[in-house]
Curated annotation (Swiss-Prot):
Disulfide bonds join 46-82, 48-71, 64-83. One of its GO terms (molecular function) is toxin activity. Probable toxin. Residues 1-20 form the signal peptide. It comes from Nematostella vectensis (Starlet sea anemone). InterPro entries: Myo_ane_neurotoxin_sf (IPR023355). The keyword tRNA-binding does not apply. Keywords: Disulfide bond, Signal, Toxin. This is N.vectensis toxin 6.
């Protein structure tokens, strides 16, 4: 006969698995918006070599989001890109 503890553990695991399968997943654009540097505009701008203007690009952590183009100075740092809209 199945013990009470075994039934409780199985129900708990079932709830965890069902809950994990139905978690909302963020889109890539939402993730990049969350990590966009917009606290101080003077620190979030970067030089985009395409047009040679200082501060014409915007620093994004990760890759450039959709609708943005990566500047020819592709990697701003090890973790960020210089992108322009």
């Amino acid at each position: 006969m199945i013990s009470f503890k075994t039934v409780i553990v199985c129900l708990f695991l079932w709830v965890v698995i069902i809950g994990a399968r139905h978690r909302p997943v963020k889109l890539d654009d939402e993730i990049f918006r969350d990590y966009h540097i917009d606290i101080d505009p003077s620190k979030s701008s970067c030089r985009c070599d395409d047009d040679g203007a200082e501060g014409s690009g915007t620093v994004w952590y990760g890759n450039c989001p959709s609708g943005w183009a990566m500047c020819t100075s592709s990697h701003y740092s090890a973790f960020a890109e210089c992108c322009k809209q």
